[in-house]
Swiss-Prot record:
EC number of this enzyme: 6.3.5.-
More details: This protein may be expected to contain an N-terminal transit peptide but none has been predicted.
Designated name of the protein: Glutamyl-tRNA(Gln) amidotransferase subunit B, mitochondrial
Catalytic activity of the protein: L-glutamyl-tRNA(Gln) + L-glutamine + ATP + H2O = L-glutaminyl-tRNA(Gln) + L-glutamate + ADP + phosphate + H(+)
Subunit description: Subunit of the heterotrimeric GatFAB amidotransferase (AdT) complex, composed of A, B and F subunits.
Organism: Candida glabrata (strain ATCC 2001 / BCRC 20586 / JCM 3761 / NBRC 0622 / NRRL Y-65 / CBS 138) (Yeast)
Localisation per UniProt entry: Mitochondrion
The organism's taxonomic lineage, starting at the top: Eukaryota, Fungi, Dikarya, Ascomycota, Saccharomycotina
Length: 542
């Protein structure tokens, strides 16, 4: 009965506290956490066969992307795919790891339906790389510290397993899909350097961006291209491994629950008895449940694989690969957050961080487009900052690409950076208002999507402005502008709205009046002139 109370009471309290957003680490009970990340490599072929790597193809039929080796037909032998070694080299160098110039493959023995060989080929004794690190910065990531370095214990190349699919119903059938079998993985093991949840979340995001930037993995947890296990302990009691964590929110919630569970056990004086041995627990979506303990753990009987030669890499090869690595996200963020761009972190991340796989634009291509527009702008307006082109590209332009589902590479040669700058220049010259510029930009992107504009099209902005009568109403005199403003005010039935506006109690009402003026003029009036006239007519003092 006492054992049951240990399990249920913290569960009920955790769910209650978590629902109310009350989770917090207790300073007297230190969280120590490490991660094991399996990164599925998007190589052309599998790790030890010439089978096409279709791991990311979710529409392929089961057991159609397999070879004799993948299904472990007797007599078949492995042939190492060196593209996987190249990808591992890129990742190891990007994580500042020490690459073992000679590494080996080993057999990890266990029996499971989706592992037809009876063992997994991995690197246990001589892993591919060791002693790496990934540094998190408070200026770029959402962490409390100015700087936090997470040490990487090792990186190892290994083969993925197949998938077990459990059918519902009375027969309890288990089906095996071996399409994923022998797909190359890199297993990354960190030191237990994480001390709070913010650090864990920031590391996962930064690592996802890294593998996407290197173009070695999609980094998607939801599709299984990246899978993460968590090792966790409280106050240096025995480590608990958490499995079955399909996404970032599951990882966060599982850590919260497990911390609360161990905290309750320790506070009740049961730590020495219940947290003495390492154990593996699974996440059900609401709690962690015991899968196995030290007594029931598997003896993997590691042994060197006699069929696969050592991986031997020359120093000059490592240096050549290093010279091809892309600029780090941290360096790019520093570039765009400093002069001449001076972007806030939110906008800099749009250009630099592949937080999500965005099908509308490639980040490198977007950075080039942005820089080219800024170069044109600086030549014309050397004394101006770059706030205007930044806002137009990172808000209006990207917003239209996403809204209309139009890819940047489809529009790049039609709405060139110089043409985009011309749109901004016409707006600054007063030929067209900001609202009309937005309408014109939307029209151009939409015409690219529908095929009206093609790569052979020559966009003439002035011609389009005349065709759609988007010219700014620059011929209107002050008296006519005053008449428009008074007409809008006369149509306002809510006298209290005007009183609160004049007194300053509801200053936002002025934007409403300006919006009415822009609507009546179809965006052709200057909003600043409208606001100035409304202030004059209403005698606004604030």
């Amino acid at each position: 009965m006492y054992k049951n109370s240990i399990r249920t009471r913290p569960l009920k309290r955790f769910i209650s506290n978590h629902a109310k957003g009350k989770f917090a680490l207790d300073p007297a009970y230190k969280l120590k956490c490490g991660l094991e990340i399996h990164t599925q490599l998007n190589t052309r072929y599998k790790l030890f066969s010439y089978t096409s790597n279709e791991a990311e193809n979710l529409t392929i039929s089961p057991n159609t992307s397999t070879s004799h080796y993948d299904i472990s037909l007797p007599g078949t032998q492995p042939r190492l795919n060196y593209e996987a070694v190249l990808y591992a080299t890129k990742l190891a160098l990007s994580l500042d790891s020490d690459i073992n110039l000679i590494s080996q493959f080993d057999r990890k023995h266990y029996f499971y339906g989706d592992q037809p060989q009876g063992y997994q080929v991995t690197q246990h004794y001589k892993p591919f790389a060791k002693n790496g690190k990934l540094t998190l910065y408070g200026a770029y990531e959402d962490i409390n510290e100015n700087e936090k370095t997470i040490r990487i214990e090792q990186l190892q190349i290994e083969q993925d397993t197949g998938k077990s699919l459990y059918a519902s119903g009375a027969d309890m059938t288990t089906m095996i899909d071996l399409n994923r079998s022998n797909v190359p993985l890199i297993e990354l093991v960190t030191k237990p350097d994480f001390e709070d949840l913010k650090q864990v979340r920031a590391f996962i995001k930064k690592y996802q961006d890294l593998v996407r930037r290197l173009n070695i993995c999609t980094g998607n947890l939801e599709t299984g291209s990246m899978r993460i296990d968590v090792n966790l302990s409280v106050n240096d009691f025995a480590r608990v491994e958490l499995k079955n964590l399909p996404n970032t929110s599951s990882i966060m919630n599982a850590i919260k629950f497990e911390y609360e569970r161990q905290l309750h056990i320790i506070k009740n004086g049961e730590g020495e008895r219940l947290l003495r041995d390492t154990e593996t627990r699974g996440w059900t979506g609401s709690e962690t449940v015991k899968l196995r303990s030290k007594e029931t753990s598997i003896d993997y009987r590691y042994m060197p694989d006699p069929e696969i030669p050592f991986i031997t890499i020359a120093d000059d090869v490592v240096h050549k690969v290093k010279s091809t690595l892309p600029v780090s996200a941290d360096a790019l963020l520093r570039e765009f957050m400093n002069k001449p761009y001076n972007l806030p972190i939110k906008h800099a991340k749009i250009l630099c961080i592949s937080g999500n796989q965005n099908e509308m634009y490639d980040h490198e291509q977007l950075r080039k487009y942005y820089k080219d527009v800024c170069v044109h702008y600086q030549k014309e307006y050397p004394d101006d900052n770059l706030k205007i082109p930044s806002n137009w590209i990172l808000n209006e332009f990207i917003g239209n690409l996403n809204k209309l589902e139009t890819k940047l590479n489809e529009i790049y040669e039609i709405l060139t950076p110089s043409t985009f700058f011309e749109l901004i220049r016409l707006m600054k010259q007063g030929v067209i208002t900001g609202n009309s510029s937005k309408l014109l930009l939307f029209h151009i992107v939409n015409n690219v999507k529908t095929g009206v504009f093609t790569k052979s099209s020559q966009i003439n902005l002035k011609q389009l402005i005349n065709e759609y009568e988007l010219q700014a109403a620059d011929q209107i005199n002050e008296h006519e502008l005053e008449e428009i403003c008074r007409s809008i005010i006369d149509d306002i039935k809510d006298e209290k709205l005007l009183q609160n506006l004049i007194s300053g109690k509801k200053k936002t009402s002025l934007k409403f009046l300006v919006g009415q003026g822009m609507r009546l003029s179809q965006g052709r009036l200057n909003p600043n002139e409208l606001e100035k006239m409304f202030r004059q007519v209403l005698d606004i003092k604030w």
